[in-house]
Amino acid sequence: MTLWINGDWITGQGASRVKRNPVSGEVLWQGNDADAAQVGQACRAARAAFPRWARLSLAERQVVVERFAGLLERNKGELTAIIARETGKPRWEAATEVTAMINKIAISIKAYHVRTGEQRSEMPDGAASLRHRPHGVLAVFGPYNFPGHLPNGHIVPALLAGNTIIFKPSELTPWSGEAVMRLWQQAGLPPGVLNLVQGGRETGQALSALEDLDGLLFTGSANTGYQLHRQLSGQPEKILALEMGGNNPLIIDEVADIDAAVHLTIQSAFVTAGQRCTCARRLLLKSGAQGDAFLARLVAVSQRLTPGNWDDEPQPFIGGLISEQAAQQVVTAWQQLEAMGGRTLLAPRLLQSETSLLTPGIIEMTGVAGVPDEEVFGPLLRVWRYDSFEEAILMANNTRFGLSCGLVSPEREKFDQLLLEARAGIVNWNKPLTGAASTAPFGGIGASGNHRPSAWYAADYCAWPMASLESDSLTLPATLNPGLDFSDEVVR
């Protein structure tokens, strides 16, 4: 029984599904997808649970959410192993994901008060108040790269605001989704407040097509995000928050410490086997001897990165990709770039057949025309050389995406120029592209999102503002507008 609907664990009536470790092939999870009828059942359960959950005080909802944080802490080791085994991540990285889930609770509570709390301004004849109300029933679509942390960034703020939820994890990480839901069950959520439906495309389409849905919160690919945007077009009454990918540029302009810059680049491009939406996809490197030396060192160090299984010792920097198919797609993308005229500096290699262990790849594309503006979701870095900083900014902005951008340079003036001209929601200076502050919004523009950033701003799309003018009594104004006559004279 792998679906959780209205407080009960039930068996899916859709297609059967098996999840294997992407490196070893070990069977980790087996179950069935939710069919359309069960998706509808989950929506009805969420709708029925909404009035009572929304009427609870924030303090009462917060008790349940904080209880969940405690359960995450007590079950950190077990959840770390589940995420690592299912995604192929090394143990150390899965542990950082669970830690981020725990920290998200306190951050979301603080953000709720700052972004969507209550305000009251006294007026001569009363007061002006601002409150925020939950939307109702929200669907949350989770990604596979952070199957615990990223859905958590939608679910926690939505529950705090008083919404009820139908959660569909990625079909590639059903085990992690189920494990997290079992902790929410232990936290004491009332039946129907949070519901779990497993499945792939058909389940997702049934969920996004529900008429009785008040909103949809999505993290995933641009292609799927665009499909959801089209599907919900003409329905302005539904909130839609899209956090999608990027074709992110990292500008290496001037380097004082080559190894430090190489470390930053590897953290930006290859952490999580390149499966972060903020990963550097395009390395923009200044022409000249220093750039040549940096590039040679980057290739040499990247060549030593050997992917390993989640529990290998010593622990590897990167593990496998989410699937053998995903790894093969990266290899295919590299082959296509090479066929276009790209110069391979480091060829990505599948270490074994029927596995997702893929070594990083680096290919120079300077002077190659018609390079696709697409996100290759894996450890493949494309390199372009430039002559002037103005040219670098033009190259950085030459994308339909707009998620992250970074600069390595000792010159503050150049960073200030980049801040003014960059088209990206995250712009870092001498920091990895994959780093983000928990007290800042997370999202991009263009094909990277629809102006609904998550993280610190997630509270914004989980509630709507209600403004009020209030007075505890009603009296006739001393001065009336022209044309109003409240005298006792009888009109003849």
From Swiss-Prot:
It is an enzyme of class 1 (oxidoreductase). It catalyses: N-succinyl-L-glutamate 5-semialdehyde + NAD(+) + H2O = N-succinyl-L-glutamate + NADH + 2 H(+). GO terms for biological process: arginine catabolic process to glutamate; arginine catabolic process to succinate. GO terms for molecular function: aldehyde dehydrogenase [NAD(P)+] activity; succinylglutamate-semialdehyde dehydrogenase activity. The active site is at residues 243, 277. Disulfide bonds: none annotated. NAD(+) binds at residues 220-225. Its EC number is 1.2.1.71. Keywords: Arginine metabolism, NAD, Oxidoreductase. It holds the Pfam family Aldedh. Pathway: Amino-acid degradation; L-arginine degradation via AST pathway; L-glutamate and succinate from L-arginine: step 4/5. PANTHER family: ALDEHYDE DEHYDROGENASE-RELATED. Belongs to the aldehyde dehydrogenase family. AstD subfamily. Catalyzes the NAD-dependent reduction of succinylglutamate semialdehyde into succinylglutamate. This is N-succinylglutamate 5-semialdehyde dehydrogenase.
